[in-house]
Regions:
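DUTPase catalytic domain/fold
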Residues: 1-84
Length: 84
């Protein structure tokens, strides 16, 4: 499989470019850009800004956002359109 290039645009100067936390990481960490801490009540939903926009190289590519391991079981928090 050939490597692909994903172009990105910084929309907020506070944004962090996704990065792999360890050499064995399966995916890069994506961070929120918030003006103040966010608290969600049970069943409340919210869009969480990252301060980034991405451009995939073509229709054969997809970008997926996964919750961190244990986030749902430990905190009852999951993504509305999450995988799994």
């Amino acid at each position: 499989m050939e490597p692909i290039t994903v172009n990105y645009k910084v929309l907020d100067a506070r944004a962090k470019v996704p990065a792999y936390a360890t050499p064995g990481s399966a995916a890069a960490d994506l961070c929120a850009v918030l003006d103040e801490p966010m608290t969600l009540e049970p069943m409340q939903r919210a869009l969480v800004p990252t301060g980034l926009a991405i451009e995939l190289p073509g229709p054969q590519c997809v970008a997926l956002v996964y919750a961190r391991s244990g986030l749902s079981i430990k905190h009852g928090l999951c993504m509305a359109n999450g995988v799994g």
